[in-house]
Amino acid sequence: MKHLPAQDEQVFSAIQDERKRQQSKIELIASENFVSEAVMEAQGSVLTNKYAEGYPGKRYYGGCEHVDVAEDIARDRAKQIFGAEHVNVQPHSGAQANMAVYFTILEHGDTVLGMNLAHGGHLTHGSPVNFSGVQYNFVEYGVDKETQYIDYEDVREKALKHKPKLIVAGASAYPRTIDFKKFREIADEVGAYVMVDMAHIAGLVAAGLHPNPVPYADFVTTTTHKTLRGPRGGMILCREEFAKQIDKSIFPGIQGGPLMHVIAAKAVSFGEALKDEFKTYAQNVINNAKRLAETLKKEGIELVSGGTDNHLVLVDLRSLGITGKVAENVLDEVGITVNKNAIPYDPEKPFVTSGIRVGTAAVTSRGFDLEAIEEVGAIIALALKNHEDEAKLEEAKQRVEALTNRFPLYTGLDY
């Protein structure tokens, strides 16, 4: 960085500190990843200066001919990756992508079927503290109490009983493969639309390692970060018949000017996702998650549903006698970043929880292999089982430092 250190020392210092944190800690938050330096360069470009309300070729401002190119590239690449008929890359976030779909097909008070937040759903899938739960009549489905897999019969029974206008599939903390075909079949029985929120698994879908929801859903929403490894933002994929309505719901419906520098960064990351190297990366993400799950189970730690099919593992801490809040703090102390997370049928409050969610997208981007991820699992077990033993926690800290030194991050940056 050439100008920021001299112009604004306080902000530069915060950026430096965050850079050091990312280097010195092991990032296991399942919704985070490390983008390429090319993505960061696009996002930090002169495109940040350009207002571009509207869509390519139909803008409300002049001088958009070059940002139009960037947006067209992003849309075309996303179509190619996922086989979608129409793509909107303007949503600022996954939540706004979901909002746009709701505003497109729902009226206030309409019935929607969505996954219970504590069972792995998302705030925007009907939580009473979110606009979705306030605006619409959400009926919740969840996972089977024994298997902790989605109970598709429960989904069907509730659909038949409540006749929802929309069924939402997808999750923020569900470690198993979702059967989108089954959701489509249930929706067809009751004449409902299907929206799939694939925010967490989009990168795995892009690599052909998770079933693609596009053939089964009327609408697919996603973030562009997480496993897709792009900038923070959202995206909507839909059938051509809904294209104009979706575009109107985004602009002028719920957003004004799109963030053209972010859209350019999305385009760069989509280009990366089309390469063979990305498929290898995504396979390694899954391999690492499975190995992490196996390691934790060998250490006697319980996992929701017994394991994982994707990039994340949901840990049930009750047998260890600690809460998710305590575990998050203990692991942060030794240099491992996770988030506390509710587990199905959780007796604890949402800010306390009985679980933690861990994911392998970021550490895999950093280069962690199976041997390294086994060591991560062993360190987690050591810290959680000995969370009040300062000597053991110091040992865990040193082992984390050895790993982070072995896998440096962003060596080309000058700050």
Swiss-Prot record:
Lineage: Bacteria, Bacillati, Bacillota, Bacilli, Bacillales
Record InterPro entries: PyrdxlP-dep_Trfase, PyrdxlP-dep_Trfase_major, PyrdxlP-dep_Trfase_small, Ser_HO-MeTrfase, Ser_HO-MeTrfase-like, Ser_HO-MeTrfase_PLP_BS, SHMT-like_dom
Associated pathway: One-carbon metabolism; tetrahydrofolate interconversion; Amino-acid biosynthesis; glycine biosynthesis; glycine from L-serine: step 1/1
Presence of keyword Transferase: yes
Annotated (6S)-5,6,7,8-tetrahydrofolate binding sites: L117, G121, H122, L123, E241
Cofactor list: pyridoxal 5'-phosphate
Biological role stated in the UniProt entry: Catalyzes the reversible interconversion of serine and glycine with tetrahydrofolate (THF) serving as the one-carbon carrier. This reaction serves as the major source of one-carbon groups required for the biosynthesis of purines, thymidylate, methionine, and other important biomolecules. Also exhibits THF-independent aldolase activity toward beta-hydroxyamino acids, producing glycine and aldehydes, via a retro-aldol mechanism.
Subunit structure comment from the entry: Homodimer.
Subcellular location: Cytoplasm
Any one cellular-component term (Gene Ontology): cytosol
Keyword Acyltransferase: no
Example GO molecular function: glycine hydroxymethyltransferase activity
Alphabetical UniProt keywords: Amino-acid biosynthesis, Cytoplasm, One-carbon metabolism, Pyridoxal phosphate, Transferase
Record protein name field: Serine hydroxymethyltransferase
Family matches, as HAMAP family: SHMT
Biological processes annotated in GO: glycine biosynthetic process from serine; tetrahydrofolate interconversion
EC number: 2.1.2.1
